[in-house]
Structures are given as C-alpha cells and as structure tokens.
A protein has these predicted regions:
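C-terminal edge-of-domain segments
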Residues: 141-165
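Short, hydrophobic/π-rich interface segment
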Residues: 91-145
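N-terminal accessory segment detector
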Residues: 1-94, 102-112, 146-148, 163-167
Length: 167
C-alpha cells in the first residue's frame, strides 16, 4: 500500500514531538562515511544489518496473535527509542511494513543508506521471533519519494544471493 499524505502528516507530527540530539549528528555522519570508505558498501551493509539484528535481539517482541498486535508492539518499542512508527499490511506473498518518522539525520541523503540495512536487520529478526520462515528477510521495497515520506519494506522469501524475491 503506497504512503498517503496522512502518513506524511503522521511523521511530521511525530518529528515535532521528538527532540533530535545534535551532539552526535556530525560524529555519526563522519563515522559511517569513514566506515563505508574503509570496508566498502557491501560489507558495510552486512555489518549494519547485523547491528540491526543485535538491536532487535536486545529489544525482543513477545509472540503476537496477529499483524495488528505485532504492529502495536513494534510501535511501542519504536516510541520508546524515538524511531518512528509502522503500519503493517499483508501483501500477496509478502508482508509490507510502512515505516515513517524513522531516525532523521540532517546530513543529506547518504544517511538513508546507513539506516536501511539496520532496519532490515531489525525487522528480519522481529518477524523471525514471530515464527517467520528462516528463508525470509526484510528488504527495502521503495525509497521515499519525498522528504518525510515513509520507507516501504517487504518481508519475503530471499533468493540464493540474499535479495528478497519479487517486488
């Protein structure tokens, strides 16, 4: 389901309630840029996805009876750590996660490439904790079309190279 104007307004309202710490912005941007330059983008993505997996393991979710309960649990965790909100939809052969008001670092568009693998690791582990198939992974399906628009992530079966199968 594509994000709507209401989804963007929800994110803007969320950002207005949050206080982003400016003390780490430049440090984190420099650290990630240096890290990616030294190890390359593929290894950086693997590391960041593993970091997201570890975050999810440190913030485990109890088994949920349905997607609505899972959405509520994820939103509760994300509210506690200031990482935005999600809406979860069942698709044809995948589960779609609409993630808005994700951490925002005002350092250009490059930061998004660092955040996405972290989120992919988090969602992959959380869905596995719900009894998800080990052959499934969370992968970015669509980047935001405008600033503040939600990310679209699909949880689905992976191919032999680790990419999610289908669109």
């Amino acid at each position: 389901m594509p994000p709507t104007l209401d989804d963007q307004l929800i994110s803007m309202s969320y950002y207005a309630r949050q206080q982003c710490s400016r003390q780490w912005v430049h440090f984190m941007a420099a650290m990630f840029a240096e890290f990616e330059e030294r190890v390359g983008p593929i290894e950086a993505d693997r590391f960041l996805e593993a970091l997201g997996s570890r975050m999810a393991q440190s913030l485990p979710l109890p088994r949920c009876a349905n997607l609505q309960e899972l959405e509520n649990r994820i939103n509760s965790v994300f509210e506690d750590i200031g990482w935005g909100w999600v809406r979860i939809f069942e698709g044809d052969g995948f589960i779609e996660i609409l993630h808005g008001a994700y951490p925002n670092v005002p350092q250009g568009e490059q930061w998004r490439s660092w955040l996405v693998p972290i989120l992919e690791g988090i969602f992959t582990v959380w869905f596995a904790q719900q009894g998800g198939d080990e052959s499934c992974v969370a992968r970015l399906a669509a980047a935001p079309q405008s600033p503040g628009a939600p990310l679209i992530i699909h949880y689905r079966r992976r191919d032999h190279e680790g990419a999610a199968v289908g669109g």
